[in-house]
């Protein structure tokens, strides 16, 4: 009972080393990744006028956001502009799989960073004396680096398609805008700067995790023999067993 209670010992030294310091950066970057993507809400507007009175424009709006199921984002108007039921018309595309994969993975990374930092700071000796924990940490780090590349690339492609689907191109694709009784002009679309930032942080995370892989590797048994040899060389030759 006493051993279990005294096992946790606060040691902030690992936070000053690359292993712990980079993990803090990974934790912060993960927060920015899922917050900038998962918290986005925007809208795109088109201006509609009814012929022959084309001087009077009315606004029709489609609101969209995470997880970016644009095919469920219907257009809304104060009334049936030009006799059209705009609610039955939606944007094009479903990009929820890429967006949710990216955000969900970022949340898991966020949680793992907390667990890893707790291990580094509270159980420093347990981590460094164990052969399994550093190896597990190293494998997770390598896998996370790869998944950051995959998830961010998929999300970047989806973001490009989202920008196209909410751009002036929608005027050409909306069926009511093709009718002779209506005239449509693109109005505006919410800036997607925060989504661009999410992509940047995704690739930044990949770089951080890829770089940190080396420092995690140095804690594993794959690298420890070289450290052991170095320490033996400084302290003198170790006699063979039995002598």
Annotate each language-model stretch with its function.
Residues 2-124:
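N-terminal helical submodule of small eukaryotic multi-pass membrane proteins
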